[in-house]
A protein has these predicted regions:
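Positively charged n-region of N-terminal signal peptides that target proteins for export
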Residues: 1-4
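C-terminal motif of bacterial Sec signal peptides marking the signal peptidase cleavage site
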Residues: 16-19
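A domain-start/cap signature at the N-terminus of enzymes
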Residues: 21-22, 30-33, 39-101, 189, ...
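Low-complexity, Pro/Thr/Ser/Glu-rich flexible segments characteristic
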Residues: 24-48, 326-344
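Gly/Ser-rich "nucleophile elbow"/oxyanion-hole loop immediately N-terminal to the catalytic nucleophile
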Residues: 94-95, 99, 153-192
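Primarily recognizes the serine-hydrolase "nucleophile elbow" in alpha/beta-hydrolase
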Residues: 177-178, 184-228
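C-terminal catalytic histidine-bearing segment of alpha/beta-hydrolase fold enzymes
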Residues: 235, 240-244, 260-388
Length: 388
């Protein structure tokens, strides 16, 4: 059974999440308490978020300047296929081989594929936040960031993968043996191509990750049923039609199978404090699966119109927008658009791909590329990940 959660969207009005909660109607207040059916027995989890400064990840350029050189580059040759990839690895200060450390595996989008192994470090926040002084002071950990010579999967012409996807599982195993990794605390995350790869591996190998953070990607939902037993948070921007529709498909699968999850709509303009407040409310759902959509119009579109970055020889791919008739669940209250407000009061999720009329593929790609870093500034979510 699904768990319902309502969060007010008031960042665009300059109001705090707390003040916003004070203006809710009685109906919204009732749903914001994570209403459950009789069959839902999960209680709210106790979290210890707030240990790490929630504003440290705001400046991407500063992260790149400070930490992109903190990684070593190592070649891995796969015995099964003979293929070679270069991975970036960060070892915590005072690394001791006799100890065991949690490990984050971050996989970038396809714009980072190519000959420059460090491209996956400098494209955005996703790799470097985990190696920052602020994060490592509270969570000493190993960070693994592979870079592939080519795009490793295709979601445009059906769903297909190259040998590099399965190679990634063997790479993680190899690194876990080579370094002092606590194999019960491996955390998977990635954006776009990296999100899709992490979705696939989490589904195929249920014991691989302790928890996952999926960021703006999608995959064939018929292959993802094992996610129902996984612990994760899944981010997608509503203006990124492919990723958002893919996320909705997973929620619909959970609905059909009676699996609990918590969903909330967030505002991309929220401050670090507002994001932390929203995270606390989200986690009060007490489920293992969390879904967050960035409200339409709250993500600033990127100037990028292609997945082919400076390190990429081929484009990433996206499915055309999919119309879904999935069962509607509770969503946070209104944005500026009255139609969204009416849908919220009715307990509906926003329709995929509707955002502000930006339904062209080019505009969707711009929002897609821009949305990655929004997830990796949610420090409280990162802290929750490491509690698993």
């Amino acid at each position: 059974m699904k768990k319902l959660l309502a969060l007010m969207l008031c960042g665009a009005m300059g109001l705090s999440a707390v003040a916003c909660g004070q203006t809710e109607t009685e109906e919204t207040t009732e749903t914001s308490e994570a209403v459950e059916t009789e069959e839902t027995t999960a209680e709210a989890e106790t979290t210890s978020t707030g240990t790490v400064d929630n504003s440290f990840a705001e400046d991407t350029d500063a992260l790149v300047e400070a930490y992109s050189d903190a990684f070593d580059q190592v070649e891995y040759t796969d015995d099964e296929t003979g293929l070679t990839v270069t991975y970036n690895i960060y070892l915590p200060e005072g690394y001791d081989e006799s100890e065991e450390y949690p490990m984050v595996v971050f996989i970038a989008d396809s714009s980072c594929a190519g000959d420059d192994a460090t491209a996956s470090l400098t494209q955005g926040r996703g790799a470097l936040v985990w190696a920052s002084d602020e994060w490592q002071a509270a969570n000493p950990s190993i960070v693994l960031v592979p870079t592939y010579p080519e795009t490793i999967l295709d979601d445009q012409n059906g769903y297909s993968t190259t040998e590099y996807v399965e190679l990634t599982k063997r790479l993680i195993d190899d690194v876990s043996e080579e370094y002092a990794v606590d194999t019960d605390r491996i955390y998977g995350t990635g954006q776009s191509m990296g999100c899709m790869t992490t979705l696939i591996l989490a589904s195929e190998y249920p014991d691989l990750y302790a928890a996952c953070m999926f960021v703006d990607g999608q995959w064939d939902v018929s292959t993802l049923s094992a996610l129902e037993d996984q612990t994760f948070i899944y981010f997608a921007a509503e203006d990124d039609t492919s990723a958002y529709n893919g996320m909705q498909e997973v929620m619909s699968m959970f609905d059909e199978d009676g699996v609990d999850y918590t969903y909330a709509q967030w505002d991309g303009t929220w401050t670090p404090d507002e994001l932390s407040e929203a995270t606390s409310e989200l986690l009060s759902g007490g489920t293992n699966a969390y879904f967050v959509s960035w409200a339409s119009g709250t993500i600033e579109a990127s100037s990028e119109t292609s997945f082919a970055g400076p390190n990429s020889s081929s484009d990433d791919s996206e499915k055309p927008a999919i119309d879904t008739d999935s069962e509607k669940t509770e969503v946070s209250a209104d944005t500026e658009a009255s139609e969204d407000a009416e849908s919220s009061e009715a307990g509906e999720k926003p329709e995929g791909g509707k955002g502000n009329g930006n339904d062209s593929m080019m505009q969707s790609v711009q929002y897609h590329m821009a949305s990655f870093d929004y997830a990796y500034r949610c420090v409280a979510v990162m802290e929750w990940l490491f509690e698993n």
